[in-house]
């Protein structure tokens, strides 16, 4: 009997200890959950509380509010001021340009023919040589009813120390066309917009008017003199043709 009594007492003590530990663990768990709920905006007064659980939702982000926040976080937006720049492209037939690489089985231009080229570049007032053009034209089609051709052109305009501009788009030999300004370097970093191409004498004389956006500063006066009205008879100033110091920009591209 004594042994049975001791065993029952041991079992009772063990059970009480287990119950006490479970109760403490339960309270710790509730405290942990309570802290987690608070992190999500949920409050709880614990078990047995008569007050209901409350939830504080975040404000709904409407499209208008999201757009407003995005606009507010935008820094240094691209400048939208339009600056005009005019240049003449002239081929004196002394640069072994253009080259015609035939792919189409025709004596005329046909789809896939390639025309790499490089020509001389002058300011719009024809007083200074600034550099060269360099790029590639891909023949898209011959247009017999207009006695001309359509090219897809990708090329750059080099301005010596000032940097360069790159363009891409249609080059039509029978009418004016517009190409996209795809970028630039030097003072032309960040440039975008479009350029108007006017064919004066095919393929040796062209006039361009750039409508530049995205530039950080105004164009230098040296590049934006009053342009000579485009015509097939225009010629660069003698100083520019002879590459005299007064007729070229700094480190002009040749």
UniProtKB/Swiss-Prot annotation:
Transit peptide residues according to the UniProt entry: 1-78
Domain of life: Eukaryota
Record GO biological process: jasmonic acid biosynthetic process
Region (Disordered): 44-79
Keyword annotations of the record: Chloroplast, Isomerase, Plastid, Stress response, Transit peptide
Composition skew (Polar residues), residue ranges: 65-77
InterPro entries in the cross-refs: Allene_ox_cyc (IPR009410), Allene_oxi_cyc_Dirigent (IPR044859), Allene_oxi_cyc_sf (IPR034871)
Cell compartments where the protein resides: Plastid, Chloroplast
PANTHER family on file: ALLENE OXIDE CYCLASE 1, CHLOROPLASTIC-RELATED, ALLENE OXIDE CYCLASE 4, CHLOROPLASTIC
Function statement: Involved in the production of 12-oxo-phytodienoic acid (OPDA), a precursor of jasmonic acid.
Additional facts recorded: The four allene oxide cyclase proteins (AOC1, AOC2, AOC3 and AOC4) are encoded by duplicated genes. They are very similar, and most experiments involving antibodies do not discriminate between the different members.
Protein name per Swiss-Prot or TrEMBL: Allene oxide cyclase 1, chloroplastic
Originating organism: Arabidopsis thaliana
